[in-house]
């Protein structure tokens, strides 16, 4: 069974160029992305809920396209496996003032492609 793969691209970031600053003070929070061919769960979380920041085992930053690609892992039993994003995502994104950055997450599972839009601010 192939591991799920997610590709994150900055879909909208107003005032990014010129003068784009690294997003350092704001952390990205989101619910777990539970991967299995039957469905995908995920979405924004409020920081006040005290949930852990999303993380990943391995990720690579694709500078020309402004995308972050990483692979998830599937458990030995083949059941859904949590797929998480790295803390470094926030340092790779850009923001200015209180402008929100929208990230589109394309997730590939064994037999389907699903698109999930997550909002980080």
Swiss-Prot record:
The protein's name in its UniProt record: Putative protein ATP11AUN
Region (Disordered): 34-62
High-level lineage: Eukaryota, Metazoa, Chordata, Craniata, Vertebrata
Composition skew (Basic and acidic residues), residue ranges: 43-53
């Amino acid at each position: 069974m192939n591991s799920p793969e997610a590709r994150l691209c900055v879909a909208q970031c107003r005032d990014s160029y010129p003068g784009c600053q690294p997003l350092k003070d704001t952390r990205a929070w989101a619910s777990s992305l539970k991967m299995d061919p039957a469905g995908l769960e995920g979405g924004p979380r409020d920081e006040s809920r005290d949930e852990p920041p999303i993380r990943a085992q391995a990720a690579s930053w694709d500078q020309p396209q402004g995308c972050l690609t990483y692979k998830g892992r599937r458990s030995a039993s083949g059941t859904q496996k949590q797929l998480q994003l790295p803390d470094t995502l926030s340092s790779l994104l850009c923001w200015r003032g209180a402008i929100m950055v929208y990230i589109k997450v394309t997730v590939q599972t064994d037999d389907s492609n699903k698109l999930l839009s997550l909002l980080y601010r």
